[in-house]
Regions:
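ATP-grasp fold ATP-binding core
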Residues: 148-149, 176-197, 218-231
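Glycine-rich beta-alpha junction loops
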Residues: 46-49, 165, 189-192, 226-229, ...
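Structured helix-beta-strand junction loops
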Residues: 36, 123, 179-180, 216
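Hydrophobic beta-strand scaffold residues
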Residues: 40, 126-127, 155, 184, ...
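Phosphate-binding site of ATP-dependent enzymes
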Residues: 198-242
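ATP-binding N-terminal substructure of ATP-dependent carboxylate-amine bond-forming enzymes
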Residues: 1-128, 132-133, 137-143, 147-150, ...
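Basic phosphate/pyrophosphate-binding loop/patch that engages nucleotide-derived ligands
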Residues: 147-155, 212
Length: 242
Protein backbone atom coordinates (compact mmCIF):
# COMPACT_ATOMS: atom_id res chain seq x y z
CA UNK A 1 0.00 0.00 0.00
CA UNK A 2 1.47 3.34 -1.05
CA UNK A 3 2.09 6.08 1.51
CA UNK A 4 -0.29 9.06 1.46
CA UNK A 5 0.97 12.15 -0.31
CA UNK A 6 2.44 14.98 1.71
CA UNK A 7 0.57 18.25 1.23
CA UNK A 8 3.16 20.95 0.50
CA UNK A 9 2.37 24.66 0.36
CA UNK A 10 4.87 26.27 -2.02
CA UNK A 11 5.14 30.01 -1.40
CA UNK A 12 6.24 32.44 -4.11
CA UNK A 13 6.24 36.12 -5.05
CA UNK A 14 6.32 38.17 -1.88
CA UNK A 15 6.38 41.78 -0.75
CA UNK A 16 9.97 42.17 -1.87
CA UNK A 17 12.09 43.80 -4.55
CA UNK A 18 12.98 40.23 -5.56
CA UNK A 19 9.35 39.33 -6.31
CA UNK A 20 10.04 38.62 -10.00
CA UNK A 21 13.05 36.42 -9.22
CA UNK A 22 10.89 34.31 -6.92
CA UNK A 23 8.34 33.76 -9.68
CA UNK A 24 11.08 32.41 -11.96
CA UNK A 25 12.45 30.15 -9.22
CA UNK A 26 9.12 28.67 -8.16
CA UNK A 27 8.21 27.69 -11.70
CA UNK A 28 11.24 25.38 -11.78
CA UNK A 29 10.52 24.05 -8.29
CA UNK A 30 6.90 23.21 -9.10
CA UNK A 31 7.92 21.44 -12.30
CA UNK A 32 10.57 19.33 -10.57
CA UNK A 33 8.69 18.24 -7.44
CA UNK A 34 7.33 14.70 -7.75
CA UNK A 35 3.54 14.94 -7.87
CA UNK A 36 3.30 11.21 -7.17
CA UNK A 37 4.70 11.97 -3.71
CA UNK A 38 3.42 15.48 -3.03
CA UNK A 39 0.11 17.30 -3.22
CA UNK A 40 1.28 20.77 -4.22
CA UNK A 41 -0.47 23.96 -3.15
CA UNK A 42 1.09 26.96 -4.92
CA UNK A 43 0.54 30.06 -2.78
CA UNK A 44 1.30 33.39 -4.42
CA UNK A 45 1.98 36.54 -2.41
CA UNK A 46 1.54 39.88 -4.17
CA UNK A 47 3.87 42.84 -3.77
CA UNK A 48 1.28 44.42 -1.49
CA UNK A 49 1.24 41.32 0.73
CA UNK A 50 -2.00 39.62 -0.33
CA UNK A 51 -1.98 35.80 -0.24
CA UNK A 52 -3.70 33.60 -2.83
CA UNK A 53 -3.97 29.86 -3.37
CA UNK A 54 -3.25 29.55 -7.09
CA UNK A 55 -4.73 26.66 -9.09
CA UNK A 56 -3.98 27.81 -12.64
CA UNK A 57 -1.31 27.19 -15.27
CA UNK A 58 2.34 27.34 -14.21
CA UNK A 59 3.18 29.34 -17.33
CA UNK A 60 1.29 32.32 -15.91
CA UNK A 61 3.50 32.50 -12.83
CA UNK A 62 6.79 33.34 -14.54
CA UNK A 63 5.79 36.80 -15.77
CA UNK A 64 3.25 37.57 -13.05
CA UNK A 65 0.10 37.00 -15.09
CA UNK A 66 -1.20 34.70 -12.35
CA UNK A 67 -2.25 37.85 -10.48
CA UNK A 68 -4.86 38.59 -13.17
CA UNK A 69 -6.04 34.98 -13.33
CA UNK A 70 -9.44 33.77 -12.12
CA UNK A 71 -7.67 30.72 -10.65
CA UNK A 72 -6.86 32.55 -7.40
CA UNK A 73 -8.47 31.95 -4.04
CA UNK A 74 -7.76 34.37 -1.17
CA UNK A 75 -5.94 32.65 1.66
CA UNK A 76 -3.64 33.30 4.58
CA UNK A 77 -1.23 31.34 6.72
CA UNK A 78 -2.84 30.80 10.09
CA UNK A 79 -0.62 31.31 13.14
CA UNK A 80 -2.99 29.06 15.12
CA UNK A 81 -1.30 25.65 15.53
CA UNK A 82 -4.64 23.82 15.57
CA UNK A 83 -5.31 24.92 11.98
CA UNK A 84 -1.95 23.45 10.87
CA UNK A 85 -1.85 25.33 7.60
CA UNK A 86 -3.86 27.78 5.57
CA UNK A 87 -7.18 29.51 5.95
CA UNK A 88 -8.91 29.64 2.56
CA UNK A 89 -11.82 31.91 1.69
CA UNK A 90 -14.86 29.91 0.55
CA UNK A 91 -18.39 30.99 -0.35
CA UNK A 92 -19.52 30.22 3.20
CA UNK A 93 -16.54 31.84 4.92
CA UNK A 94 -12.95 31.04 5.79
CA UNK A 95 -12.08 27.34 6.04
CA UNK A 96 -8.87 25.64 7.25
CA UNK A 97 -6.75 23.72 4.74
CA UNK A 98 -4.27 21.38 6.38
CA UNK A 99 -0.66 21.51 5.22
CA UNK A 100 2.09 19.01 6.08
CA UNK A 101 5.04 21.14 4.97
CA UNK A 102 5.73 24.68 3.78
CA UNK A 103 8.31 25.22 1.03
CA UNK A 104 9.14 28.95 0.80
CA UNK A 105 10.53 29.92 -2.60
CA UNK A 106 10.72 33.57 -1.60
CA UNK A 107 13.73 35.83 -2.09
CA UNK A 108 14.83 38.82 -0.05
CA UNK A 109 12.98 40.67 2.67
CA UNK A 110 9.76 39.22 4.07
CA UNK A 111 10.83 35.80 2.85
CA UNK A 112 14.44 34.97 3.66
CA UNK A 113 15.03 37.36 6.56
CA UNK A 114 13.45 35.37 9.39
CA UNK A 115 10.06 37.11 9.37
CA UNK A 116 8.23 34.34 7.53
CA UNK A 117 10.16 31.72 9.45
CA UNK A 118 8.93 33.28 12.69
CA UNK A 119 5.34 33.02 11.51
CA UNK A 120 5.86 29.37 10.58
CA UNK A 121 7.37 28.67 14.00
CA UNK A 122 4.33 30.27 15.67
CA UNK A 123 2.07 28.06 13.55
CA UNK A 124 4.25 25.02 14.41
CA UNK A 125 4.48 24.16 10.74
CA UNK A 126 7.50 22.26 9.39
CA UNK A 127 9.24 24.17 6.61
CA UNK A 128 12.12 23.95 4.17
CA UNK A 129 15.16 26.15 4.76
CA UNK A 130 16.96 27.89 7.58
CA UNK A 131 15.38 28.83 10.90
CA UNK A 132 14.68 32.28 12.29
CA UNK A 133 18.17 33.04 13.63
CA UNK A 134 20.07 31.75 10.60
CA UNK A 135 17.74 33.51 8.17
CA UNK A 136 17.92 36.85 9.98
CA UNK A 137 21.69 36.79 10.41
CA UNK A 138 22.45 35.74 6.85
CA UNK A 139 20.08 38.27 5.29
CA UNK A 140 22.02 41.14 6.88
CA UNK A 141 25.40 41.14 5.11
CA UNK A 142 26.93 43.38 7.77
CA UNK A 143 25.95 41.06 10.64
CA UNK A 144 26.96 37.98 8.61
CA UNK A 145 30.44 39.44 8.00
CA UNK A 146 30.84 40.19 11.72
CA UNK A 147 29.90 36.60 12.60
CA UNK A 148 32.28 35.17 9.98
CA UNK A 149 35.10 37.38 11.25
CA UNK A 150 34.45 36.33 14.85
CA UNK A 151 34.64 32.69 13.73
CA UNK A 152 37.96 33.28 11.98
CA UNK A 153 36.56 32.98 8.45
CA UNK A 154 38.18 35.40 5.97
CA UNK A 155 35.87 37.86 4.20
CA UNK A 156 36.37 40.67 1.72
CA UNK A 157 37.64 43.89 3.28
CA UNK A 158 34.94 46.49 3.56
CA UNK A 159 32.96 48.89 5.72
CA UNK A 160 29.33 49.76 6.38
CA UNK A 161 27.69 53.12 5.75
CA UNK A 162 24.40 54.11 7.40
CA UNK A 163 21.79 56.42 5.93
CA UNK A 164 21.99 59.70 7.80
CA UNK A 165 25.71 59.19 8.40
CA UNK A 166 26.93 59.12 4.79
CA UNK A 167 30.25 60.97 4.40
CA UNK A 168 30.66 63.54 1.66
CA UNK A 169 31.58 62.07 -1.75
CA UNK A 170 35.16 63.27 -1.32
CA UNK A 171 35.45 61.77 2.20
CA UNK A 172 33.94 58.47 1.08
CA UNK A 173 36.28 58.23 -1.90
CA UNK A 174 39.26 59.01 0.33
CA UNK A 175 38.21 56.23 2.74
CA UNK A 176 37.98 53.76 -0.15
CA UNK A 177 41.41 54.76 -1.45
CA UNK A 178 42.97 54.48 2.01
CA UNK A 179 41.36 51.22 3.12
CA UNK A 180 40.29 49.22 0.07
CA UNK A 181 41.51 50.56 -3.25
CA UNK A 182 39.56 50.63 -6.50
CA UNK A 183 37.36 49.06 -7.75
CA UNK A 184 34.79 48.41 -5.02
CA UNK A 185 31.31 46.90 -4.90
CA UNK A 186 28.50 48.81 -3.22
CA UNK A 187 25.60 46.71 -1.90
CA UNK A 188 22.36 47.22 0.01
CA UNK A 189 22.87 45.16 3.16
CA UNK A 190 19.50 43.38 3.24
CA UNK A 191 18.87 42.49 -0.39
CA UNK A 192 19.85 39.60 -2.63
CA UNK A 193 19.82 38.67 -6.33
CA UNK A 194 22.25 41.57 -6.97
CA UNK A 195 19.44 44.13 -6.62
CA UNK A 196 20.92 47.59 -6.03
CA UNK A 197 24.51 46.35 -6.37
CA UNK A 198 27.00 48.48 -8.33
CA UNK A 199 30.70 48.37 -9.19
CA UNK A 200 32.56 51.65 -8.71
CA UNK A 201 35.97 52.46 -10.14
CA UNK A 202 36.25 56.11 -9.08
CA UNK A 203 34.70 58.78 -6.85
CA UNK A 204 31.99 59.71 -9.33
CA UNK A 205 30.84 56.11 -9.77
CA UNK A 206 31.02 55.59 -6.01
CA UNK A 207 28.65 58.50 -5.35
CA UNK A 208 26.17 57.15 -7.92
CA UNK A 209 26.46 53.63 -6.48
CA UNK A 210 25.74 54.89 -2.96
CA UNK A 211 22.68 56.76 -4.16
CA UNK A 212 21.40 53.62 -5.91
CA UNK A 213 22.00 51.34 -2.91
CA UNK A 214 20.33 53.75 -0.49
CA UNK A 215 17.15 53.57 -2.58
CA UNK A 216 16.70 50.04 -1.24
CA UNK A 217 18.19 50.01 2.25
CA UNK A 218 19.25 52.25 5.12
CA UNK A 219 22.53 50.36 5.47
CA UNK A 220 25.08 49.92 2.67
CA UNK A 221 28.15 47.71 2.44
CA UNK A 222 31.23 48.86 0.51
CA UNK A 223 33.65 46.02 -0.25
CA UNK A 224 36.85 45.49 -2.17
CA UNK A 225 36.54 43.71 -5.52
CA UNK A 226 37.87 40.16 -5.53
CA UNK A 227 38.60 38.27 -8.73
CA UNK A 228 37.84 34.59 -8.42
CA UNK A 229 35.40 31.76 -8.99
CA UNK A 230 32.05 31.79 -7.22
CA UNK A 231 31.30 28.54 -5.40
CA UNK A 232 27.84 27.58 -4.16
CA UNK A 233 27.34 24.84 -1.59
CA UNK A 234 24.03 23.37 -0.49
CA UNK A 235 23.88 22.10 3.10
CA UNK A 236 21.23 19.65 4.30
CA UNK A 237 20.63 18.96 7.98
CA UNK A 238 18.96 15.61 8.62
CA UNK A 239 18.41 14.75 12.28
CA UNK A 240 21.51 16.72 13.31
CA UNK A 241 23.65 15.08 10.60
CA UNK A 242 24.96 17.70 8.16
Amino acid sequence: MSSPKLTVAVLFGGASTEHDVSQLSVTSVLRELDRDKYELLPVGITRSGEWFLYTGELSLITDGRWEQSDARIPCLLSPVPAHHGLMVQKADGWQPLRVDLVFPVLHGMNGEDGTLQGLLELARLPYVGCGVTGSANCMDKDIAKRLFTAAGIPTARGFTVYRGEVPSPAELAAKVEAELGWPVFVKPVNLGSSVGVSRACDAEELAAAMEEALRYDCKVLVEEAITGAEVECAVIDRKSVV
